[in-house]
């Protein structure tokens, strides 16, 4: 028999079991803050989509401060919250698994009495998924003060139920996350296989028994004996006509190819100074931080000046070279020819690009290879899409599972 329910009075919670309480956050948890005056090698922790994790200081990603002096100490078993920029922060709550230091901008909360921090981690994650606190936030940075947070009402199951719910969700979520992790690994294997297949076929062709020779170009390696290599300048020429986006549809150069620019994309002041693109042109972004953004344009239009527009010369198969240019090894070669002040932000312009050597099979082989790869990549991408859909379904299942149990709509 289902248990008796009551209205919690909290919009994002709905009904809860009749014996559960509704209290302010400040009644069940309290904010603590201990500043570390001098860093002495403690673990540095960050709040991420994966929870509160240890940062790799030897191979850091993202911004790093000059010193960790002045960071705050955080304690295993507490909750870490980000109460600022909650509209754009992917995850605003995490359970602290290990002692360490973190940015003083975060807010640490310690549970009062025997309330279970794991339970409230799940509850607050459920609320954060839908950004339910956003309408309560103040100022341009969408922030909540710790006092504001303390005055927000929450639900309080009996301690025994908190513990049962937390334990049950730990077990269930672990199993789901394991499946998600394994599925992501399979997706990465498919993507690696796709890259390997493209590189092998565009440089060696479809005949496995053909005699090979060294191309003389390091990034290409061996090619069939009947093939040659040539500079890009002998296969494409640069289209460098300057136009306005008022007359020519603005296009975006993405990793998925050339697409119509979205209406909400931030516009620059250079709308009257763009490059002309004709349908069938190949367009590639010259900046290294846009690696892989390229493709054949299906549209007439215009692109920003950072892009290089290539017009095919003579008899060639544009689709074949589209595959060539999308290989990882070509991307390495392309950006190796670039120039810039910052190592990871180089630009490779036409004057550099035109001297890069590329394989040149016969036009018949180009067509055969392009047709074969189109079919194979469609099959691989379809398998990837199915796995990605499975991940979406599992993520939604996790959210549903957490919601139903932390709000008492399902009983363990």
Describe each region flagged by the PLM:
Residues 1-13, 18-19, 157-211, 360-412:
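Amphipathic alpha-helical coiled-coil/heptad-repeat segments
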Residues 111-116, 312-317:
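Ligand-binding loop in jelly-roll beta-barrel domains
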Residues 40-60, 79-104, 118-122, 131-135, ...:
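Short, ligand-facing micro-motifs at secondary-structure edges
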Residues 3-36, 151, 159, 163, ...:
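Non-catalytic DNA-recognition/assembly elements of restriction-modification systems
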Residues 8-9, 23-37, 41-76, 233-279:
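Sequence-specific dsDNA recognition surfaces
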